[in-house]
């Protein structure tokens, strides 16, 4: 038996039926009556908890707090769950190199294991933390970001200029996926000033009619200064 492809494992039709497209969230889900929304949140929370209890990291972390699955019966019990830190995750990586034991891969049979998207944190505070995404969790992340963009008014006829980087960090990659997979807008993946020179970024925005820019505020402010130097307002 061959392993499932990314798109098969993602389950696009089922995902759309369950979560809706970004415009569905803005027009329907965000306006859902509180009791109906709480019921939906509770169902999804319990589903996530059932999966998490199969993962050694959470078994160990919650077990240390004397919790059992029977202690968490609804989303109202979420305050019983002890928080965990990056230090906890990196301790897992140290004990179970190279990716730790918090990812849930061992819950799948070899032939059913989905493809993975692998990223890391930036490592600015130490060793980079591995970030692993299965197809469905990856696309749900992308969809959540696309909802955020939709709520800010991004539509299919927009041209977005992104200055998020595209190294091992997740930033620019999931921004690109969110925009292309879920908004229908045109994306200029310029990246950082190292990837595309700042003067070239300004030219790209002018030539292709960028209607919005996404990224870190300090660099966007810097690009505004570059644009003025280039005679663009």
Which residues make up each language-model segment?
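Short glycine-enriched loops at secondary-structure junctions
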Residues: 115, 138, 165-169, 218
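Conserved ATP-dependent adenylate/AMP-binding module captured primarily in the ANL superfamily
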Residues: 79, 141-159, 196-209
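Nucleotide 5′-phosphate-binding alpha/beta core
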Residues: 1-120, 127-140, 151, 207
């Amino acid at each position: 038996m061959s392993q499932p492809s990314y798109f098969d494992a993602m389950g696009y039709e089922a995902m759309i039926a369950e979560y809706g497209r970004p415009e569905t969230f803005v027009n329907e889900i965000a306006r859902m009556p509180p009791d109906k929304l709480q019921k939906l949140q509770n169902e999804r929370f319990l589903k996530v908890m059932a999966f998490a209890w199969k993962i050694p990291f959470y078994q160990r972390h919650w077990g240390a707090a004397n919790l059992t699955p029977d202690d968490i019966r609804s989303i109202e019990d979420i305050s019983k769950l002890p928080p965990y830190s990056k230090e906890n995750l990196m301790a897992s990586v140290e004990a179970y190199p190279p990716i730790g034991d918090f990812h849930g891969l061992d819950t799948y049979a070899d032939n059913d294991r989905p493809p993975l998207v692998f990223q890391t944190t930036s490592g600015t505070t130490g060793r980079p933390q591995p970030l692993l995404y299965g197809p469905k969790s990856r696309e749900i992340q992308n969809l959540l970001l696309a909802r955020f963009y939709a709520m800010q008014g991004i539509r299919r006829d927009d041209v977005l200029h992104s200055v998020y980087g595209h190294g091992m960090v997740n930033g620019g990659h999931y921004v690109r996926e969110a925009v292309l997979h879920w908004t229908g807008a045109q994306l200029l993946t310029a990246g950082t000033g190292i990837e595309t020179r700042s003067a070239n970024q300004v030219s790209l925005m002018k030539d292709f009619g960028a209607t919005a820019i996404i990224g870190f505020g300090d660099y966007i402010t810097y690009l505004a200064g570059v644009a003025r130097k280039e005679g663009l307002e």
